[in-house]
Regions:
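Short, basic, low-complexity termini and linkers enriched in Ser/Thr/Gly/Pro
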Residues: 1-5, 9-15, 110-122
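N-terminal nucleotide/polyanion-binding subdomain common to many enzyme families
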Residues: 3-7, 12-101
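Short glycine-rich anion-binding loops that position phosphate/pyrophosphate groups of nucleotides
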Residues: 49-52, 186-191, 214
Length: 265
């Protein structure tokens, strides 16, 4: 299967109505295909049952997921549903946001280490989103795990909607950093919609991943499910058990809604 790349055209903003269906989405097939993604400016989003349900009632979010360059299946439910409904894409496995993060960071670390041996400048990775406290923890851990990378951060204002001035400040900060890898972490669907809406204003030439929860996982402020739960497709159940008050609606009601949406497809 070829990498699920829609194309690297910067002109992503499209006012046409999107008919959002899992059956017709182009989704990356396996973790191995991450190595085949083209270089340059590339928008990488994730999809799971929750984000699918949200996109069904949020037109801009649906456009962001449909018109991005790469869509990865961050949920066993997506993998199984694609098989069940005989979708165009047949992903072989779940690719978590953490898998994307680890792959991209390790790749950039190797490239940066090689540059450092030649006395050249380090590669730059930028984290845009979350609180300054979390970002400080990210910088500290990155220095230990990825010592050859230069880490730049930006914590946007904590508000439901950014003003035009806020957006300009964020965009200017990203463009000034000119990163070799950019992570956007503001939770879904805000992070996907913001990145998609301002894509043409980002004068950068790197992979851009929207991976909200990974910021907290890497910083250590939120515990990720143990490996056994991940390998058996039960990370959602682990999160539900850890945070039942916050997660019950997303997983109990949300998973039922996702199943119903698949029946309708």
């Amino acid at each position: 299967m070829e990498p699920a790349v829609y194309g690297c055209d910067d002109n992503k903003i499209n006012s046409n109505t999107v008919m959002f269906r899992l059956k017709t989405l182009t989704i990356l097939g396996s973790k191995a295909e991450l190595a085949s993604l083209p270089e340059g400016k590339l928008l990488i989003n994730t999809i799971n049952a929750h984000s699918f349900n949200t996109a069904k009632k949020d037109q801009l979010f649906a456009e962001a997921l449909t018109n991005g360059d790469v869509l990865i299946p961050d949920g066993v439910s997506i993998v199984k549903a694609c098989k069940w409904i005989k979708a165009k894409s047949q992903p072989k496995e779940r690719i978590a946001g953490w898998d994307l993060f680890s792959f991209e960071m390790e790749k950039l670390e190797r490239e940066s280490e090689e540059l450092r041996t030649k006395s050249e400048e380090s590669k730059i990775v930028m984290f845009m989103g979350s609180s300054q406290k979390v970002l400080d923890l990210i910088v500290k851990r990155a220095a230990e795990v990825y010592p050859h990378l230069k880490v730049v951060t930006y914590s946007p204002p904590y508000k439901p909607e950014f003003s035009d001035e806020d957006n300009k400040t964020i965009i200017d900060a990203i463009n000034a950093a000119n990163p070799d890898l950019l992570w956007i972490g503001m939770t879904a669907p805000k992070q996907e919609k913001w990145t998609y809406s301002h894509w043409n204003e980002l004068n950068i030439h790197c992979h851009v991943g929207t991976i909200g929860a990974v910021f907290d996982f890497f910083a250590g402020t939120v515990e990720r499910a143990p490996i056994w739960w991940q390998e058996h497709g039960l990370e959602w159940l682990y999160r539900l058990m850890k945070e039942p008050k916050r997660m019950w609606r997303r997983y109990i009601i949300g998973n039922s809604l996702f199943l119903w949406n698949m029946v309708k497809e």
